[in-house]
Amino acid sequence: MDERLLGPPPPGGGRGGLGLVGAEPGGPGEPPGGGDPGGGSGGVPGGRGKQDIGDILQQIMTITDQSLDEAQAKKHALNCHRMKPALFSVLCEIKEKTGLSIRSSQEEEPVDPQLMRLDNMLLAEGVAGPEKGGGSAAAAAAAAASGGGVSPDNSIEHSDYRSKLAQIRHIYHSELEKYEQACNEFTTHVMNLLREQSRTRPVAPKEMERMVSIIHRKFSAIQMQLKQSTCEAVMILRSRFLDARRKRRNFSKQATEVLNEYFYSHLSNPYPSEEAKEELAKKCGITVSQVSNWFGNKRIRYKKNIGKFQEEANIYAVKTAVSVAQGGHSRTSSPTPPSSAGSGGSFNLSGSGDMFLGMPGLNGDSYPASQVESLRHSMGPGSYGDNIGGGQIYSPREIRANGGWQEAVTPSSVTSPTEGPGSVHSDTSN
């Protein structure tokens, strides 16, 4: 802007300044009659004022086309103009009138509760703040919740958890640093711009602080999105590596084999004693409570669908019979049958052991001829096979009216069925 923005001084030494821009004829800035001070009548009423306003508007429209050097030159001319203090005082008066409405609308906004929750979670997981082993603490807590010591597999998984948590922490801090850097750069740019404008128009320090808070609120949306995505990544990581319920759900194949073998060999009374539970827990590498829960669930599933588990019972019957036959190969007397026999399905030996011919073993191979001959020898005339008379090694036991298990009146080693598989009730005991 040049001197024309503030209005040229009137001819003849009249009052100059802002009042002359767009003054009407007969006003305080022009003599009556709209002519020259000398009394001439050649002037057009209001013509010069309209021309000045048109020139000002034209200059405003061309501001965006100015180069940086031209803008600096015009800014310097404005600051050096003799009417600059008067213009600044007028702007201050206008600001005082409108300042009340600005102050009344300015209120301190409370901290977002969602942002506080995200910050607390990131601190608890060891992602935000100084690294104090938050991931290790979370892994240890999950291991304690699983109800047992830390096995080698668990220790490997916990090591993977800590490694991936460190990656999440690194990504979070690097992105947060980029966000803070961008926010600081933009805030600095705005503050420099306001300081430069304060030389032309009144800008209070409180207004600068308010503008900084507005900028931070705008950037806080990016910060919240970053923290929320980081929390989601941590929760997914915890569900994959530290879910205690998933650890309790799966047993190893060897542990399941040991538990099933005990269950079907004690099918007449599948309630292991505390000593037996401790022994099974030691063999399987699990806790006593897990053994109790497994037997309770197994009894319920077996009674609800006895036909489904008949094939599984037959497999364990074959295993037991083969082990008995191998143990009695060197003796002339018949082998001793299992102490607590009984199974969900019938298994006819027919006294000769011919049924084992051509039957695949548990691992997919056929039984050797030596084992078959040994079994025939042990199941020969007058032996255990004739005693049961083509009966069953394992047979379903009677079930009490209240749904419990009942011992048969026959000897504990060999029994015959008294009730078909259809008579099944749900097990309500533990």
Curated annotation (Swiss-Prot):
Residues in the DNA-binding region annotation: 244-306
Cell compartment(s), UniProt: Nucleus
Region (Disordered) residue spans: 1-52, 327-347, 375-430
Intrachain S-S bonds: none
Keyword line: Activator, DNA-binding, Homeobox, Nucleus, Phosphoprotein, Transcription, Transcription regulation
GO BP terms, alphabetized: embryonic limb morphogenesis; positive regulation of transcription by RNA polymerase II; proximal/distal pattern formation
SUPFAM superfamilies (UniProt xref): Homeodomain-like (SSF46689)
Region (PBC-A): 55-134
CDD domains: homeodomain (cd00086)
GO molecular function: chromatin binding; DNA-binding transcription activator activity, RNA polymerase II-specific; DNA-binding transcription factor binding; RNA polymerase II transcription regulatory region sequence-specific DNA binding
Main localization category: nucleus
Sequence ranges assigned to domain PBC in this UniProt record: 48-243
Any GO CC annotation of this UniProt entry: transcription regulator complex
Entry-annotated residues carrying Phosphoserine: S136, S151, S159, S330, S395
Name this polypeptide is given: Pre-B-cell leukemia transcription factor 2
Gene designation: Pbx2
